[in-house]
UniProtKB/Swiss-Prot annotation:
Protein's gene: rps2
Protein name: Small ribosomal subunit protein uS2c
InterPro entries: Ribosomal_uS2, Ribosomal_uS2_bac/mit/plastid, Ribosomal_uS2_CS, Ribosomal_uS2_flav_dom_sf
SUPFAM superfamilies noted in UniProt: Ribosomal protein S2
Keyword Ribonucleoprotein: yes
Main location: plastid
Pfam families, A to Z: Ribosomal_S2
Keywords for this protein: Chloroplast, Plastid, Ribonucleoprotein, Ribosomal protein
GO BP: any one term: translation
Length: 229
């Protein structure tokens, strides 16, 4: 796909960081200036690192690697599911449950439970149960779907993680690092670039910014899948 231009990044508001007092000094190399107490990110670096991330993802997809999209904040939730589905990947967009990756064996048992309940629902088993029991199972199914629907077909740990809002998803970031899973993440001015493998300096709050970057990353995965080795 064509590289994202500086004009596109600018229009999407990718350059807007947080208020200066909220910054992480480790982000200093990626900050262009400060304006009205708001840090402005260097879009030249954002474009270069987005290109690097895209190249990495395309290559990983060519090798048949798997991807997990992580983003639970309201601005990102729907986009995370949409883009992950568009490249046939996995996602967590409601709530990160501690141990989702590091306690994979336990998580697999919860996924098995989800699939059992879904089968019971499809077979209309709930209609044969006492009202109270049926209600409890429906509530359990709804909760499991919310938390696990995006990873219910994930049979092994993902090869690459794509994260929106490092601060919010720190538990997921720590689990990925513990397991050696490479992380690509949009990093706002309050983030820590040392905790990711490929940082993409950018606004992780604005929907337009999140959408532009996620779509670009997804396009690269799809390009790679077309030429799977």
């Amino acid at each position: 796909m064509a590289d994202i231009t500086l004009a596109q990044l600018l229009e999407a508001g990718v350059h807007f960081g947080h208020k200066a007092y909220r910054w992480n000094p480790k982000m200093f190399p990626y900050i262009y200036t400060e304006r009205n107490n708001i840090h402005i990110l260097d879009l030249v670096q954002s474009a270069q690192l987005l290109k690097e991330a895209n190249s990495y993802l395309q290559s990983a997809a060519e090798k048949g690697q798997t991807f997990l999209f992580i983003g639970t904040k309201p601005q990102a939730s729907a986009l995370i599911a949409q883009e992950a589905k568009r490249c046939n990947s996995y996602y967590v967009n409601h709530r990160w449950l501690g141990g989702m990756l590091t306690n994979w064996v336990t998580l697999k048992s919860r996924i098995a439970r989800l699939k059992t309940l879904e089968q019971e629902e499809a077979d209309q088993v709930f209609n044969l149960l006492p009202k109270k029991e049926a209600s409890l199972r429906r509530k359990e199914l709804e909760k499991l779907r919310k938390n696990l629907n995006g990873i219910k077909d994930m049979e092994k740990l993902p090869d690459v993680a794509i994260v929106i809002d490092q601060k919010r998803e720190m538990t997921a970031v720590i689990e990925c690092r513990k397991l050696g899973i490479p992380i690509i993440s949009i990093l706002d001015t309050n983030c820590d670039p040392d905790l990711v493998d490929i940082p993409i300096p950018g606004n992780d709050d604005a929907v337009g910014s999140i959408k532009l970057v996620l779509q670009s990353l997804t396009d690269s995965i799809n390009t790679g899948k077309l030429t799977t080795k």
